[in-house]
Regions:
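Short linear motifs embedded in intrinsically disordered, charge-biased segments
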Residues: 3-298
């Protein structure tokens, strides 16, 4: 990719830029205390051979895709046209186009939803989309019923079964939760799924009080019996540790710049922000959170 980026500069291909403002308390270089701000090119995002390129217009997208394929060809590789997809984020057109670019006379599919590294991305949902939550729930439930003979076997101690649940099922339910920006409805679905599994594992978990629809065991009581962590608490803890880790990273780190994103948002309503969500839950100011993160108090 280093060769591709160098060639992109020579061909004047422009990638998407994003603004950032790192608070002074989080600046770890010699400019500590002065703040750090600017723009950064999102020239590429990738893991192994799974690459993401971001452009502001179709012209640069087309040039970048052709140049990427040319660069790979020079090294005995090529772009897999069948697996390559495009997506228009926040598309304002009423009719979402099925394709917007070609490569070697083959149309590249333009999708509304794409799965990248196990997570679903939706073209017009700035926060964690419902497709991602549906996928997480389906994945967790499939694993739960796959192991149902063990997880719902009362002859096995509950503590052992809960440990198996958290290790093999909850890990699927909360996969990549460190970067989630959920609304209250989505969080309730995650919690409901987890407690529904606990009810199946605990004897008389679905028993109701006489003449009412109320369960004998509330969710809180289920948690006490199982001696496990509430899913909301688990997700919050994961996000707090992740954000604190990013705060301690070098100021040049792209993750740190993305965490303190300062792009203008023109969409009405509350702007989803992992940084604001985490600091808001800790009941402390952003500066206090940064100081605790640097001191590794989290």
């Amino acid at each position: 990719m280093r060769v591709f980026i160098q060639r992109s500069k020579r061909h004047h291909i422009k990638f998407t830029k994003t603004r950032y403002t790192i608070p002074g308390a989080a600046v770890l270089t010699q400019r500590h205390g002065l703040g750090n701000y600017g723009t950064v090119d999102l020239d590429w995002i990738g893991y192994a051979d799974d690459l993401v390129l971001a452009f502001d217009d179709i012209e640069n997208l087309s040039k970048g895709l052709v140049l990427l394929n040319t660069t790979l060809t020079d090294y005995g590789m090529q772009v897999n046209v069948g697996k390559t997809k495009t997506m228009i984020l926040n598309c304002k057109e009423e009719n979402y186009p099925s394709t917007i670019v070609d490569l070697e006379n083959v149309s590249i599919e333009n999708v509304k939803v794409f799965q990248y590294l196990g997570s679903y991305i939706h073209f017009n949902q700035a926060n964690t989309g419902d497709e991602e939550i549906n996928m997480r729930i389906d994945s967790a439930e499939c694993k739960f019923y796959e192991m149902g003979k063990k997880l719902m076997n009362y002859k096995i101690s509950l503590s052992t079964r809960v440990m198996m649940l958290n290790s093999l099922v909850r890990s699927r339910l909360t996969y990549a939760c460190q970067t989630w920006t959920l609304n209250s409805r989505q969080m309730e679905r995650i919690c409901s799924t987890y407690f529904g599994m606990l009810r199946k594992m605990i004897r008389n978990g679905y028993k109701r009080e006489r003449d009412t629809y109320r369960y004998v065991y509330s969710n809180q009581r289920l948690q006490e019996i199982a001696k496990t962590e509430h899913p909301c608490s688990f997700i919050n803890r994961q996000q707090r540790s992740f954000v604190a880790h990013i705060v301690r990273r070098d100021d040049k780190c792209i993750l740190k710049k993305a965490l303190f994103n300062a792009d203008e948002v023109h969409i009405p309503g509350r702007t989803p922000s992992l940084w604001k969500n985490v600091t808001g839950r800790e009941n402390c100011s952003e500066i206090e959170f940064i100081r605790k993160a640097i001191a590794k108090d989290f």
